[in-house]
């Protein structure tokens, strides 16, 4: 019989950890080697799959070794080729999860079938789906995907549920850097904002030491150790050890006897790395973490004075220079009360306890990292859900058709921050068909975005008249990579002015189309009610606007649009005055022309269909 316990797994880029609730406290489960964390490394040797420390020890010397596979989760088409067989990131991750599951079962003494798995706050829909798939392959029912900073805050906040606090979580792991701002109060954990650098972590600090050792050895002996795989493996291990040593003491001894051979026999590498040298080598890496912190604060609309506590997460936060920088930047002493390698797994175990009912009065509110919406007329990206919106969430908006008797609408689902659809990431496409023939703007198409508790997106479109419905669940091969998220945000900042201009141009074209369409309807209604000269004047102005649009002359289009607008408004006023006079002449009885059923289009966005303000229908 399977255990009713839900284990909490921190599936990390460099290291992973697992914990379980024991009574009221989460407890880290050690691996067979006695380690409290397990390297996220898989190696294949003579048909045998090895995971963890034993795989890490051959990471450079054995070409059939896979590490940092997490950085490829959700990447469409990505595989690793091992001994003629292709493996997806989900399959490699599943091997790590299977290993963790097995030693967790040995500890618990029963079969484990359910887990809570953490992901970086930046993980998008595709990457979250891929993580769930990896769990499924490993034989785990993933009950919840939660953000790593949320999990670590849960670990820190369990004993202080009665206090309202705003917390900054600074998470510098092996391969990625994340910073999140959270609000804790009354047992509710709400993410206010997230930011980070997906190419920055402890591995980069190791590489700085390796480069320093390689350069020094080359200068002294004329031999490039970077070309020697066996030497590189030893250098990698020595660099990681030196980083840890110099984080605890003022200097570290690096001794690698028989590192290679020269013309006169064996050569040895002997070096002393001081903390000051290490700080100098890695200063640029520490500095790179500042801007994401400032960005996260800006997105949360907070200042450092609003932050009550700073939590350090990830093994790389043990580096003294990192701690000093965080203290200097925030003006607060960072909280070290929980092992930074273990906080995420402990928090995941607590969430497992919440799901089984063992932990009471705790609610997690995560956020979506990027805005979601659809493409509307003119190639505009119309957002339905803004980034940093708390999930789970649902948002609906009513649109309409852009042409008379339009039989179908294409729903182009996008994720990103740019105003034009082409500059954002396509998540999926689907079509709502069999729309009954009707004039443009009459059909009511309700588009709904649902994001579940795991951050997975479902989009539906429903014809309000026929109640015909179509929907799409965004699958893993259509998501964004972390790199794309970073690129989008940077592009959005760098191209803000150009984007604004494109958006204004698209809006002008949409307004022009709407005015031309409305003018045709108005002129048809005015026939016989105003003079032919007035009709001709309006028709000439309409033709002039049409020509400016066809010539793509934006300045002329703007001027001609204003001219036509004024003429049509004057004619409409005249029409209403005539109707009012007729009404008075008829003794106050309403005429058939008043309240002609036309809806107010002032708030209409002409989309791939046309947006209708639902309030206008009330």
From Swiss-Prot:
The keyword S-adenosyl-L-methionine does not apply. The modification Phosphothreonine is found at residue 176. PROSITE patterns: HSP70_1 (PS00297), HSP70_2 (PS00329), HSP70_3 (PS01036). Residues 603-618 have a biased composition (Acidic residues). It comes from the Bacteria. Keywords: ATP-binding, Chaperone, Nucleotide-binding, Phosphoprotein, Stress response. Residues 526-557, 578-618 are annotated as: Disordered. GO terms for molecular function: ATP binding; ATP-dependent protein folding chaperone; unfolded protein binding. The keyword Thylakoid does not apply. Induction: By stress conditions e.g. heat shock. Acts as a chaperone. Belongs to the heat shock protein 70 family. This is Chaperone protein DnaK. It comes from Limosilactobacillus fermentum (strain NBRC 3956 / LMG 18251) (Lactobacillus fermentum).
């Amino acid at each position: 019989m399977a255990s009713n316990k839900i284990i909490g797994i921190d599936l990390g880029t460099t290291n992973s950890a697992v914990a379980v609730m024991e009574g009221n406290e989460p407890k880290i489960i050690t691996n067979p080697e006695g380690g409290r964390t397990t390297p996220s490394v898989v190696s294949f040797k003579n048909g045998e799959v090895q995971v963890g420390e034993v795989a890490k020890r051959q990471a450079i010397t054995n070409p059939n070794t896979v590490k940092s596979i997490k950085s490829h989760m959700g990447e469409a088409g990505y595989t690793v080729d091992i001994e003629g067989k292709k493996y997806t990131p989900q399959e490699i991750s599943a091997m790590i999860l299977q290993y963790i599951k097995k030693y967790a079962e040995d500890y618990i003494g029963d079969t484990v079938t359910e887990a809570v798995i953490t992901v970086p706050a930046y993980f998008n829909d595709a990457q979250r789906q891929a993580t769930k798939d990896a769990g499924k392959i490993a034989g785990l029912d993933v009950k919840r995907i939660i953000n790593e900073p949320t999990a670590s805050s849960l670990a820190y906040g369990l004993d202080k549920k009665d206090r309202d606090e705003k917390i900054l979580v600074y998470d510098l792991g092996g391969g990625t850097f994340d910073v999140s701002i959270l609000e804790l109060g009354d047992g509710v954990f709400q993410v206010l904002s997230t930011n980070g650098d997906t190419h920055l972590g402890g591995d980069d600090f190791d590489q700085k030491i390796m480069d320093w050792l390689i350069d020094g050895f080359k200068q002294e002996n004329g031999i490039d150790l970077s070309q020697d795989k066996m030497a590189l493996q030893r250098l990698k291990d020595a660099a990681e050890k030196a980083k840890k040593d110099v984080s605890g003491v003022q200097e570290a001894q690096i001794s690698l006897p028989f590192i290679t051979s020269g013309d006169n026999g064996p050569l040895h590498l002997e070096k002393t790395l001081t903390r000051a040298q290490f700080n100098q080598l890695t200063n640029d890496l520490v500095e790179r973490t500042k801007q994401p912190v400032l960005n996260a604060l800006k997105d949360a609309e907070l200042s450092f004075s609003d932050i009550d506590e700073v939590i350090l997460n990830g093994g790389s936060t043990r580096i003294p220079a990192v701690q000093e920088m965080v203290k200097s930047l925030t003006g607060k002493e960072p909280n070290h009360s929980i092992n930074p390698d273990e906080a995420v797994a402990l928090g995941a175990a607590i969430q497992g306890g919440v799901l089984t009912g063992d932990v009471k009065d705790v609610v997690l509110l995560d956020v979506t990292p990027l805005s979601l919406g659809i493409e509307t007329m003119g190639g505009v990206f119309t957002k339905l859900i803004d980034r940093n919106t708390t999930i789970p969430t649902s948002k609906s908006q009513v649109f309409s058709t852009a042409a008379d008797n339009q039989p179908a609408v294409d729903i182009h689902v996008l994720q990103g921050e740019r105003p034009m659809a082409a500059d954002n990431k396509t998540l999926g496409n689907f079509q709502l068909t069999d729309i009954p023939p009707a004039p443009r703007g009459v059909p009511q198409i309700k588009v709904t975005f649902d994001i579940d508790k795991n951050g997975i997106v479902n989009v539906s479109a429903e014809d309000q008249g026929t109640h015909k419905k179509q929907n799409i669940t965004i699958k893993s091969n259509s998501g964004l990579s972390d790199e794309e998220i970073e690129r989008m945000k940077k592009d959005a900042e760098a191209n803000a002015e150009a984007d604004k201009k494109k958006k204004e141009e698209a809006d002008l074209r949409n307004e022009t189309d709407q005015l031309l369409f409305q003018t045709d309807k108005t002129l048809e209604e005015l026939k016989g009610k105003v003079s032919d000269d007035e009709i001709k004047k309006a028709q000439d102005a309409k033709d002039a606007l049409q020509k400016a649009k066809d010539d793509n002359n934006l300045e002329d289009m703007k001027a001609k649009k204003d001219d036509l607008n004024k003429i049509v408004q004057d004619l409409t006023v005249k029409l209403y005055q005539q109707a009012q006079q007729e009404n008075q002449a008829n003794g106050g009885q309403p005429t058939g022309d008043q309240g002609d059923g036309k809806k107010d289009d002032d708030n209409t966005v002409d989309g791939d269909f046309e947006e209708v303000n639902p309030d206008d229908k009330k």
